């Protein structure tokens, strides 16, 4: 009775039942929307061919999981799909329901711009965005139990090719499990790990003085993002700050950072924002922010043709010591996004080191003028200039060291490794005797551990409660242990078609801190999976009786550091 009442009272306006008739009735399938396909038979014509119908599962309007009336102390749930299944006979009176199968169509969301190099790129992006929701089919996911003739009928009705289809289970859109209620049962939840204060920047009364004194590193989500937000809020309110510059790729809907920029422009400072309007799925939000900032008087620079800007950079100019200009920079592996900073594992560096800040200023000059800087980059590795070339040189140096019988190794952490040229170089290094340890969360097109080919490469992937998003490259380099944090994965799109930035870590204490984090991950024997030739992704077993779950250990290591800072 509850299910019937719920369907009638809440779902009925949204289900849109329709009989499918080849070449006559072809409903439009919304992108990523869940549907129930129905096999039915006319009760008045039992010998006639079966018919087909389609009903929308309204998960875009209602919760995917519905709590049923239950005795005290018990919790019973039903998934929205099954309420629709239960109700289809009511929607098709006069028909016998033979079976039901779930399906979902994903449409191509790529923005196809014929020519980025002529005309108004922003107008072209806006025009392309308007057509995104009606893009061509790219993937048709269906219930594995669906009969072949039913599938063939649907392929014909919706003009699907064989390679568009993907057989899956009875329920789709597993992302919806993020909505699953917790019923207040704390013992079933992960223990809370509240972000930790980074006291040297959050508690200081002289923010820029603290950064001027030494470099500072935050590691989110273990440490609070408050230091990053404060960087902009302090700059906005500090009367000695004259300029603020930032690259915006993705930002939070309610962004304190953007609000700080608006406050800065209102107080008479010069604010310059480079907005990457080709940030996938954030194009509309970025355009809206651009319009808002421009109306407030901010100088806004937008994407330029052929290249995507993925660097995570900010720059502040401040007058100090008899009105002498001093630069401060924040460089990060992740976006200026307060929300993702709660779940993405990223590093952010605050620095006034002239070797770095002067080159950050050159990156901004390039973004604002599209003129190649006269002076080369000697410290930053910047996509479109020296990123790929310098990474290859550093690998070549390790190869030379190994061939000379000297110690040679690298530790590489990134989201994805796909670039064929870099993979070939890594194979060459392995064959020369260079030792590798790699942490690759996502795509890994390199095959580690293959005898005679890549046996010196050990690779793992860690998927846990936080998304591993930081990119870290460490090269032994004859004992120098050169370390870079970066916005770039080793994918062709990052190394060849984006403005990315890899920045060196010069502070020895920060190097130690990052290396300790990497070693915890490399020793993980709870959530780490081995990437190897067999592609089995088996969990790593270290033979150590002590369970090491790197994200939890990283948090408590950061907590010890935070407690010491606060007590001192």
Identify the role of each PLM range.
Residues 422:
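Polyanion-binding catalytic cores of nucleic-acid enzymes and NTP/SAM-utilizing transferases
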Residues 1-410, 428-432, 444-468, 472-568:
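N-terminal localization/anchoring segments of enzymes in phospholipid and broader phosphate metabolism
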Residues 435-439:
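Hydrophobic alpha/beta core scaffold segments
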């Amino acid at each position: 009775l509850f299910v019937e009442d719920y369907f009638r009272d809440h779902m009925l306006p949204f289900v849109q039942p329709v009989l499918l008739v080849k070449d006559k009735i072809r409903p439009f399938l919304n992108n990523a929307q869940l549907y129930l396909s129905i096999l039915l038979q006319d009760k008045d014509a039992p010998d006639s061919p079966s018919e087909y119908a389609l009903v929308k599962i309204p998960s875009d309007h209602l919760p995917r999981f519905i709590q049923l009336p239950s005795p005290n102390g018990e919790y019973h749930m039903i998934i929205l799909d099954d309420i629709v299944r239960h109700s289809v006979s009511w929607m098709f009176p006069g028909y016998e329901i033979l079976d039901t199968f779930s399906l979902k169509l994903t449409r191509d969301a790529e923005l196809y711009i014929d020519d980025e190099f002529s005309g108004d790129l922003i107008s072209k992006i806006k025009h392309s965005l308007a057509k995104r929701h009606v893009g061509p089919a790219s993937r048709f996911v269906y219930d594995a139990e669906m009969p072949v003739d039913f599938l063939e009928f649907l392929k014909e009705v919706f003009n699907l090719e064989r390679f568009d289809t993907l057989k899956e289970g009875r329920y789709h859109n597993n992302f919806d499990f993020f909505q699953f209620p917790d019923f207040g049962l704390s013992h079933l939840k992960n223990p809370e790990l509240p972000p930790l204060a980074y006291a040297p920047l959050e508690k200081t009364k002289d923010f820029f003085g603290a950064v001027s004194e030494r470099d500072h590193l935050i590691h989110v989500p273990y440490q609070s993002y408050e230091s990053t937000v404060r960087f902009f809020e302090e700059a906005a309110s500090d009367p000695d700050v004259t300029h603020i510059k930032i690259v915006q790729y993705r930002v939070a809907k309610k962004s304190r950072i953007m609000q700080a920029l608006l406050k800065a422009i209102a107080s008479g400072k010069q604010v310059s924002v480079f907005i990457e309007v080709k940030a996938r799925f954030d194009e509309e939000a970025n355009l809206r922010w651009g319009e808002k900032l421009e109306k407030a008087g901010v100088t806004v620079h937008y994407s330029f043709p052929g290249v995507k800007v993925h660097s995570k950079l900010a720059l502040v100019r401040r007058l100090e010591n008899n009105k002498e200009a001093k630069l401060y920079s924040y460089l990060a592996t992740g976006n200026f996004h307060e929300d993702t900073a709660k779940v993405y594992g990223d590093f952010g560096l605050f620095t006034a080191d002239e070797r770095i800040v002067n080159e950050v200023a050159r990156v901004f000059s390039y973004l604002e003028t599209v003129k190649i800087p006269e002076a080369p980059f000697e410290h930053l590795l910047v996509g479109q200039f020296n990123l790929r070339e310098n990474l290859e040189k550093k690998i070549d140096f390790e190869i030379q060291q190994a061939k000379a019988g000297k110690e040679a190794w690298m530790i590489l952490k990134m989201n994805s490794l796909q670039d064929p040229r870099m993979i070939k170089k890594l194979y060459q290094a392995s064959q020369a005797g260079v030792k590798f340890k790699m942490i690759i969360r996502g795509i890994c097109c390199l095959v580690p551990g293959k005898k005679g080919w890549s046996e010196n490469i050990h690779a793992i992937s860690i998927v846990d409660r936080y998304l591993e998003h930081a990119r870290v490259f460490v090269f032994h380099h004859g004992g120098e242990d050169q370390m870079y944090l970066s916005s770039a994965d080793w994918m062709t799109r990052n190394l060849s078609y984006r403005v990315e930035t890899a920045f060196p870590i010069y502070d020895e204490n920060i190097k130690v801190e990052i290396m300790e984090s990497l070693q915890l991950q490399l020793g993980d024997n709870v959530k780490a999976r081995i990437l190897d030739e067999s592609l089995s992704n088996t969990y790593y077993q270290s033979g150590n009786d002590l369970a090491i779950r790197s994200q939890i250990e990283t948090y408590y290591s950061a907590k010890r550091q935070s407690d010491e800072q606060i007590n001192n």
